[in-house]
């Protein structure tokens, strides 16, 4: 009895115990409390049950909805100023960042951020960032790239909301180019293969069949293609510069969190965009002021698109923090499909057969691009075993 028993010995002892007299049973039971039975060492502990993260699901939901709302009200604001030929696209883009900056200022004044309420969580504190002048200078490249990517995106979607979404889905192509040429970080061979299919998908979406001759010709909005590629390029620079920024000693602590970093980037983006707006569209500013006072579509479109842009980007950042970059990248690709279908319904403009096929190819391989390296790694590890 002084030697601890294993599981088999324990079962045998219990069966013998049942056949003993009551007095001996009491003695044996007391002894078993003094010398408890040991569980076999090779029995694994039960795995904890996976918990359903309702807040994460809500963040994803509002991220998608916020992006769709942004696209809808961005289109409304651009139509109110005359569309892509109205001469006020840069003004709309800049004032959207102005709305973002005002909202960021309100968050700092109130010292809390209500975005977590969308995930049924308590609001988090958002104190002013304790950045130095040197930190602001270091953040300027990120702010510039963010401003350029946003403005180019507005020009792209203002030219063609549907084809613009397809072009923006090809962002990994420009990202691979930028990271290879400027940062010495080329993609893997598997990713390079995916890039060819992404380009092919966008190219096929640009084709239109002549009903008389049956010959395919390239037909697309050049403005949407050019500004979409510019936007993708600056988005790639922004991502790489942001990574460089965050490894600077002590900067993350002085920023005070991801929310502060994003807010500061939007404020810098607005301040950088403002002189560009004045230099390029100053002649049309009197016209814009009249429209802003009298046109409700412009008023609502500007405010809602600016707020939606801020909120959905912040939600995207929060999902990356909770899930990791790969999962968020796949979700971002799926979001393209959601927004593409949504904008087709809102604008009443149907996708052509070529656009449907091309978009499906491009988006599918963008999703594969996001996970291909991890899939290859798992396959190699399996073969080694």
List PLM regions with ranges.
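Polytopic endomembrane small-metabolite transporters, centered on the Drug/Metabolite Transporter
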Residues: 5-10, 15-385
């Amino acid at each position: 009895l002084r030697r601890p028993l294993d599981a088999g010995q324990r079962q045998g002892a219990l069966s013998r115990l049942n056949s003993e007299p009551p007095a001996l049973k009491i003695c044996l039971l007391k002894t078993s409390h003094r010398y408890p039975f040991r569980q076999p060492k090779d029995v694994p502990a039960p795995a904890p049950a996976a918990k359903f993260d309702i807040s994460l699901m809500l963040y994803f939901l509002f991220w998608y909805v916020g992006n769709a709302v942004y696209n809808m009200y961005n289109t409304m604001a651009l139509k109110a100023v005359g569309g892509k030929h109205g001469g006020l696209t840069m003004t709309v883009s800049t004032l959207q960042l102005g709305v973002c900056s005002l909202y960021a200022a309100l968050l700092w004044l109130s010292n809390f951020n209500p975005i977590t309420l969308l995930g049924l969580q308590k609001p988090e504190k958002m104190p002013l960032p304790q950045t130095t002048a040197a930190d602001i200078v270091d953040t300027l490249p990120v702010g510039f790239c963010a401003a350029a990517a946003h403005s180019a995106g507005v020009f792209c979607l203002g030219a063609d909301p549907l084809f613009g979404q397809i072009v923006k889905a090809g962002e990994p192509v420009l990202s691979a180019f930028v990271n290879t040429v400027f940062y010495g970080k080329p993609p893997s061979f598997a990713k390079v293969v995916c890039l060819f299919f992404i380009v092919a998908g966008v190219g096929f979406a640009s084709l239109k069949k002549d009903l008389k001759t049956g010959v395919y010709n390239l037909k697309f909005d050049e403005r949407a293609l050019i500004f979409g590629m510019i936007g993708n390029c600056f988005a790639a620079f922004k991502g790489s510069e942001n990574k460089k920024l965050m490894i600077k000693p002590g900067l993350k602590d002085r920023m005070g969190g991801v929310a502060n970093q994003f807010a500061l980037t939007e404020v810098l983006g607005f301040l950088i965009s403002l002189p560009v707006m004045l230099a390029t569209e100053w002649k049309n500013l009197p016209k814009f002021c009249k429209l802003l006072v009298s046109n409700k579509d412009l008023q609502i479109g500007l405010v809602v698109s600016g707020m939606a842009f801020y909120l959905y980007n912040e939600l995207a950042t929060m999902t990356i923090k909770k899930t990791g970059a790969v999962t968020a990248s796949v979700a971002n690709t799926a979001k393209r499909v959601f927004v593409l279908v949504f904008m087709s319904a809102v604008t009443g403009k149907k996708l052509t057969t070529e656009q449907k096929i091309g978009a499906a190819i491009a988006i599918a391989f963008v999703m594969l691009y996001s996970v291909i390296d991890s899939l290859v790694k798992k396959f190699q590890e399996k073969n080694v075993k």
